[in-house]
Amino acid sequence: MLIYKDIFTDDELSSDSFPMKLVDDLIYEFKGRHVVRKEGDIILAGSNPSAEEGAEDEGSDEHVERGIDIVLNHKLVEMNCYEDASMFKAYIKKFMKNIIDHMEKNNRDKADVDAFKKKIQAWVVSLLAKDRFKNLAFFIGERAAEGAENGQVAIIEYRDVDGTEVPTLMLVKEAILEEKC
């Protein structure tokens, strides 16, 4: 299994247990699902917990959690402050600078850095379009929530796919470390 970790905070932001694609060699997109499950259960995409555990006792006092499977599995924390476009712009400007500094510090080719700048700017402009920005939710990892600075904000866009709302988590590739576990 591959875990996708934030290079700045070491937070686990997603894994290859979710359908994923790389868009424009810039953004990882992971398809999530809305789920309801007993608190603490970690269900991998594609598993069938009802078939494995038998019938659920509807009269129990167990706490049930609802949400997006990626968010629940990786303990991401919602950050409503970024729903304000000016706050998001301030964050993304600093984040882009941190990524570029990281690329340069790791001796990345100037052409790679320039290509990244061009692509990331176009992506950010597309996110800030009013009809798109209102469909975004923002999440951070546990360490970032505890105060670790410079972490990546995981952006979830709610997309309509054949009449079904599909939460799609987006992560900037250059700020992600793939780790086998």
Swiss-Prot record:
A Pfam family reported for this protein in Swiss-Prot or TrEMBL: TCTP
Main location: cytoplasm
Statement: the UniProt record of this protein carries the keyword Ligase: no
Keyword vocabulary terms for this entry: Calcium, Cytoplasm
PROSITE patterns with a match to the protein in the record: TCTP_1, TCTP_2, TCTP_3
Keyword Cytoplasm: yes
InterPro entries, A to Z: Mss4-like_sf, Mss4/transl-control_tumour, TCTP, Translation_control_tumour_CS, Translational_control_tumour_p
Subcellular location: Cytoplasm
A single GO molecular function term of this UniProt record: calcium ion binding
Transmembrane segments: none
Segments forming domain TCTP: 1-181
Origin superkingdom: Eukaryota
GO cellular component: cytoplasm
Family indicated by similarity: Belongs to the TCTP family.
Function: Involved in calcium binding and microtubule stabilization.
Protein name: Translationally-controlled tumor protein homolog
Organism: Caenorhabditis briggsae
Lineage: Eukaryota, Metazoa, Ecdysozoa, Nematoda, Chromadorea
Gene name per UniProt: tct-1
